[in-house]
Amino acid sequence: MVAKVLDGLAVSAGIFERLHRACCELENNGVCPKLATVLVGNNPASRSYVLSKHRDCKNIGIQSTLIELPANTSEKELISKVEILNASSDVSGIIVQLPLPESIDQNKVIEAINPDKDADGLHPLNLGYLVTGKQGIVPCTPAGIVKLLEAHRITLEGKTIAVIGRGTTVGRPLGILLSGKGVNATVINIHSRSRNISGLSRIADVVVACAGVKHIVEPSWIKPGAVVVDVGINQSGVSSSGKMILTGDVHPLTKNIASYISPVVGGVGPMTRAMLMSNVINLSERDFRKRLYAS
């Protein structure tokens, strides 16, 4: 058995079409959605990802602006830039590209973003809404994973799902999202201090690997027919043509055991970008409704 592909490119294309129509409707009502991205330093992977986000904006019709800051930018200076964007009436959504230099407290910067402009959905208030089940802005990658599985008609309700990794951008919010009333799955959150990791993973109907460790999930960790979602993107050198070699958290031979598996390129990545664009549109629509009711 060779696993079927969870095609994030195909699913995201449909989402982008819907978002383009929504953007046109907003513009017809005098609203121009705009995303502001802050990039600190010159990390090649971060720069590439930021540019792809801005291409998505252009294709959908969302305005975008990129604020580039040097790697030696202080935490105070970065937060000051964020506060300027918070006060800008023409900015619908804000993202600060992660990771940040070690000298900057990532959490403080995220907390400085206005929750009503938090396009990444990582502000503590929006994460709190996720915990309580209140409608809010959901972190992009967790939302994208659920959409990807739903698009392939994979039932999640009542299923056991192993989430390998407990980071604040994917693992933790994904576990909350999956166990909430909207999805109703049973979640096992596996991390570096978990015991019998392979055994816990092997009982899961769905395994989501978001540990950020190359090929940590071995074929022996997967029960036959399970669904595998590979979130990991690890840089493993450069090819002879000069292209970056990317590997996932899941060993390639896992495809011979799983029923479905997401590719490292064209799997979760496009879905994350689609959910970011969706968040920007949602924030714009929310702001439009507020202004409409206030008038």
UniProtKB/Swiss-Prot annotation:
Q: What is its EC number?
A: 1.5.1.5, 3.5.4.9
Known pathway? One-carbon metabolism; tetrahydrofolate interconversion
Q: Which reaction does it catalyse?
A: (6R)-5,10-methylene-5,6,7,8-tetrahydrofolate + NADP(+) = (6R)-5,10-methenyltetrahydrofolate + NADPH; (6R)-5,10-methenyltetrahydrofolate + H2O = (6R)-10-formyltetrahydrofolate + H(+)
Sites where the protein binds NADP(+): G165, R166, G167, S192, I233
Show the SUPFAM superfamilies listed in the entry: Aminoacid dehydrogenase-like, N-terminal domain, NAD(P)-binding Rossmann-fold domains
The UniProt keywords, alphabetically, are:
Amino-acid biosynthesis, Histidine biosynthesis, Hydrolase, Methionine biosynthesis, Multifunctional enzyme, NADP, One-carbon metabolism, Oxidoreductase, Purine biosynthesis
Bridged cysteine pairs (disulfide)? none
A single Gene Ontology CC term: cytosol
InterPro entries hit by this protein: Aminoacid_DH-like_N_sf, NAD(P)-bd_dom_sf, THF_DH/CycHdrlase, THF_DH/CycHdrlase_cat_dom, THF_DH/CycHdrlase_CS, THF_DH/CycHdrlase_NAD-bd_dom
* Cited PROSITE patterns: THF_DHG_CYH_1
User: What processes does the entry annotate via GO biological process terms?
Assistant: L-histidine biosynthetic process; methionine biosynthetic process; purine nucleotide biosynthetic process; tetrahydrofolate interconversion
One matching Pfam family: THF_DHG_CYH_C
The job of this chain, per UniProt, is described as:
Catalyzes the oxidation of 5,10-methylenetetrahydrofolate to 5,10-methenyltetrahydrofolate and then the hydrolysis of 5,10-methenyltetrahydrofolate to 10-formyltetrahydrofolate.
Record-given protein name: Bifunctional protein FolD
Q: Which gene encodes it?
A: folD
